[in-house]
């Protein structure tokens, strides 16, 4: 018989550096989840990822206070900023350019994010990532 689900918690947790401090501790503590157990399991699961990359995580809390979690790929904006070598996007999108990003870099990001995106093929995924780039004030160039 399946366990009864008590609720879901959606959090953005830095890869490999989960610790009981806020915002993670209070969010898990409210549901009665063993915080240290989650931190150890999460850090082990994100061991192969780049340290401190923001990882969207969905934690399923069961009625018996046990849990399971699903980690996704780091956020698209994080991957875009890393590829374009910028600290943040443009404050005035459409007026001030924050920089450029190559089509090949967009494809690489789209391939990484493909499992998390609502796209059927790589071309659709690239369009989604290009839209994020434009929203950040980046110009997508050939190459």
UniProtKB/Swiss-Prot annotation:
PTM field: One or more lysine residues are methylated.
Example GO biological process: translation
GO MF terms held by the record: large ribosomal subunit rRNA binding; structural constituent of ribosome
GO CC, alphabetical: cytosolic large ribosomal subunit
Alphabetical list of CDD domains matching this protein: Ribosomal_L11
InterPro entries: Ribosomal_uL11, Ribosomal_uL11_bac-typ, Ribosomal_uL11_C, Ribosomal_uL11_C_sf, Ribosomal_uL11_N, Ribosomal_uL11_N_sf
Keyword Cell cycle in record: no
SUPFAM superfamilies registered for this protein in UniProt: Ribosomal L11/L12e N-terminal domain (SSF54747), Ribosomal protein L11, C-terminal domain (SSF46906)
Highest taxon above the source species: Bacteria
Keyword rRNA-binding among UniProt keywords: yes
Keyword set, alphabetical order: Methylation, Ribonucleoprotein, Ribosomal protein, RNA-binding, rRNA-binding
UniProt cross-references to HAMAP family, sorted A to Z: Ribosomal_uL11 (MF_00736)
Family: Belongs to the universal ribosomal protein uL11 family.
Subunit structure comment from the entry: Part of the ribosomal stalk of the 50S ribosomal subunit. Interacts with L10 and the large rRNA to form the base of the stalk. L10 forms an elongated spine to which L12 dimers bind in a sequential fashion forming a multimeric L10(L12)X complex.
Function summary: Forms part of the ribosomal stalk which helps the ribosome interact with GTP-bound translation factors.
Name this polypeptide is given: Large ribosomal subunit protein uL11
UniProt source species: Erythrobacter litoralis (strain HTCC2594)
């Amino acid at each position: 018989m399946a366990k009864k689900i008590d609720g879901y918690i959606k959090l953005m947790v830095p890869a490999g550096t989960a610790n009981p401090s806020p915002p993670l501790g209070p969010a898990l503590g409210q549901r009665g989840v063993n915080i240290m157990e989650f931190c150890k399991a999460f850090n082990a699961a994100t061991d192969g990822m780049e340290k401190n990359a923001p990882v969207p995580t969905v934690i399923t809390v069961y009625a018996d206070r046990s849990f399971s979690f699903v980690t996704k790929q780091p956020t698209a904006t994080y991957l875009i900023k890393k590829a374009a070598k910028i600290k943040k996007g443009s404050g005035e999108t459409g007026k001030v350019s924050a920089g450029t990003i190559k089509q090949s870099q967009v494809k690489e990001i789209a391939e990484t994010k493909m499992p998390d995106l609502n796209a059927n093929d790589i071309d659709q995924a690239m369009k989604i990532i290009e839209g994020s780039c434009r929203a950040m004030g980046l110009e997508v160039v050939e190459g």
